[in-house]
């Protein structure tokens, strides 16, 4: 697999994005399912499997060699930890095969990574959330089919007002992406802004048993994110 990655690094660096076929090849090779439970299409490894995979990708293919794998594996851990069985059945197999590319959308233009201060909102509208706001510096943002989005479900609260909502982007009205952001390193990892204007997703896309758990969920997973 690495032999297929290396010859393309310069081209991907110039494009600021890897070819989509790479994700499918990574899925075929079993790389994307290292920590996904077997019943959902992976082979049931732990954090150690992901760490070794990241190490090998970086060692053999440089700073563009991970091509967003770290973010994909981070999102897997969120769905594993907080998703319902139905959510896991729906999303994990697609993440394992590379059919879906994932991103975690937390950072915002005006607040950085201060999650308590985010401005993006997800307001209930019947049986849906209506999402408005923007995110910046989002790895895999240009490719993402699935986004774990940090948003305020209660604008009057700080940390207790944050929830994580899964957004599937295909043909999604009101959702748009900015141009790839140029970086000093990790040039093959596409990074961009994301915009949400009255975007609607089902209430069942909430991660966790109730609203307001997002800040805790993010802090709980932060050690793995930093390792990745």
Predicted regions and their residues:
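Short glycine/proline-enriched turns and hinge-like loops at secondary-structure junctions
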Residues: 45-46, 114-116, 140-144, 158-161, ...
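Amphipathic, small/basic residue-rich leader segments at the start of a protein or domain
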Residues: 1-70, 81, 86-90, 94-97, ...
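A short core secondary-structure module
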Residues: 132-176
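Short Gly/Pro-enriched turn/cap motifs at secondary-structure boundaries
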Residues: 68, 95, 110-113, 137-140, ...
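Structural signature of FAD isoalloxazine-binding scaffolds in flavoprotein oxidoreductases
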Residues: 44-56, 114-118, 195, 201
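A gly/ser-rich beta-alpha-beta helix-loop segment of oxidoreductase catalytic cores
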Residues: 101-123
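Glycine-rich beta->alpha junctions and the first turn(s) of the following alpha-helix
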Residues: 164, 175-228
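Short Ser/Thr-interspersed hydrophobic loop/turn segments at strand-loop and sheet-helix junctions
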Residues: 30, 53-58, 150-151, 167-172, ...
């Amino acid at each position: 697999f690495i032999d297929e990655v290396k010859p393309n690094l310069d081209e991907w660096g110039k494009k600021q994005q890897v070819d989509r076929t790479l994700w499918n090849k990574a899925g075929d090779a079993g790389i994307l399912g290292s920590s996904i439970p077997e019943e959902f299409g992976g082979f049931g490894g732990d954090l150690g499997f992901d760490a070794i995979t990241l190490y090998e990708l970086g060692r053999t293919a440089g700073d563009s060699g991970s091509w967003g794998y770290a973010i994909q594996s981070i999102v897997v851990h969120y769905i594993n930890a907080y998703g319902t069985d139905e959510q896991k059945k729906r999303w994990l197999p697609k993440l394992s095969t590379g059919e879906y590319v994932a991103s975690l959308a937390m950072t915002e233009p005006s607040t950085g990574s201060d999650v308590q201060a985010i401005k993006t909102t997800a307001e209930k509208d019947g049986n849906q959330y209506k999402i408005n706001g923007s995110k910046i510096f989002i790895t895999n943002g240009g490719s993402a089919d699935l986004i774990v989005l940090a948003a305020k479900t209660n604008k009057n609260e700080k940390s207790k007002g944050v929830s994580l909502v899964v957004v599937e982007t295909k043909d999604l009205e009101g959702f748009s992406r900015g141009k790839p952001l140029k970086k000093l390193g990790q040039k093959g990892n596409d990074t961009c802004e994301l915009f949400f204007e009255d975007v609607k997703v089902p209430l069942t896309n909430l991660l966790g048993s109730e609203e307001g758990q997002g800040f805790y969920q993010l802090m709980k997973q932060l050690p793995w994110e930093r390792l990745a």
